[in-house]
Amino acid sequence: MKKLVSLLLALTMILSMAVIASAEDEPVTLKVLWWGSQTRHDTTTALCKLYEETHPNVKIEIDYAAWSDYWTKLATQVSGDTLPDVIQMDYGYLTQYAENGVLANLDEYIAAGRMDVSNAAESIIASGKWNGSVYAIPTGTNALVLMYNPALVEGYDVPTYMTYEEYIDLCKQLYADKGLTENYLAGADMNRLRFYVRNYGYELYNEDQTALGFTDAQLIADQFEYVGTSIKEGWGLNPAKSVAADTFSSITAGDTWAVLHWTNELNATETGNGVSLQMVALPAADDAVRPATFFKPSMFWSVAEKSQVKDAAVDFINFYINDLRTYEICGTDRGFPISSVVLEALTPGFSEQNQKIAAILNDMAATGNTSPIMPSDPTASAEVSDLYGDYIEKIQYGQITDYKAAAEEFMEKANELLSAGK
């Protein structure tokens, strides 16, 4: 699908200068496009009506589609020169649409304060950048965290921020005292490796996405060793139960006390499993040079480069991210507010789950425990992740014990996949 979209963009996109209409005085017709569920359609439509009421000169034409149809629809609109003014954008497609000239550069609007992102963390805004400039404004954020069951670890201190050494010491203590295991260091999720190399200033993939973003295989060997050691010593979740842990059934049953998940999964996880959970940051390398955690945009709003009403389009997005009524109508369907002021004002009215999510996101931002998000993953990343999972499984079952040799072999194969995939 991405290759088809890219071809359409390359063949049909002709750059032009937009004649910008005033968002304040002249009659404006603003076209807005998004994807999502029926609930999102209903709430966003209601928000558009509110915007029209507060901006009498603006008439909004809405358009939406399911995710499965959205990108074909958008590519068709590009080829037919019928793009909307405001486009809901996804992180995986941002580079493609920005580099093909479909999206407007928003730097001048941010500099002028017309797109007010002054209360958003720099790392959040950076997620909407391409080639050093902002082309998309995040609608909301989430982050990878360690979720744990406080009922299982009552009486033990679980700090919000831990080094690997501190985390492993806690895991060993909980296993020795209560027989509890964990499924972060023992698991097969490649985000463990991503976070580890980010701690040392690298990214998982290189800039042109033709190889891994680092050359020292010892970084991979370290992660392999964590898996092997945790299983061998018992404090890592038995691999036979790993699949169950992914759906939280094992944390509910008490087989493991901690697992890796996104913050926006808390509501469904607690409700679906009837358990109250807490969240802390993922452990960091003992000698880390930067925080590994990043705020991932739930999705974005972008402005079409060829829009004739860019001022109005920018004002609509600014209204969305900075007006409390947005979230009163739409809730946190598109993620938690990027504005710390809006988030703070809304938090008292949040559900218990949303208050916990807000607390960890706010704390990470306030304490500087995040860094800018990496570029979106290459096409071959799924194959690389599967390959990584194969190696982890063999380590979990004791079929691989020479971690350095296995790491070097994995690196070679991963680079071959990435080079071919490009």
Kindly give the residue locations of the regions a language model identified.
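Extracytoplasmic/periplasmic substrate-recognition and gating elements
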Residues: 49, 53-54, 59, 156, ...
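Extracytoplasmic "Venus flytrap"/periplasmic binding protein-like
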Residues: 50-120, 151-162, 248-258, 268, ...
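Hinge/lid segment of periplasmic solute-binding proteins
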Residues: 91-143, 168, 196, 278-282, ...
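Short, solvent-exposed loop/beta-turn-alpha elements that line the ligand-binding surface or hinge
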Residues: 107-120, 177-179, 202-222, 271-272, ...
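C-terminal capping/gating helix-and-loop segments adjacent to ligand/active sites or protein-protein/ligand interfaces
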Residues: 129, 295, 358-412
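Extracytoplasmic/periplasmic solute-binding protein
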Residues: 131-139, 144, 168-213, 219, ...
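Glycine-centered hinge/linker elements that transmit conformational signals in sensory
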Residues: 171-173, 211-241
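Mature extracytoplasmic/periplasmic domains
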Residues: 267, 299, 303-382
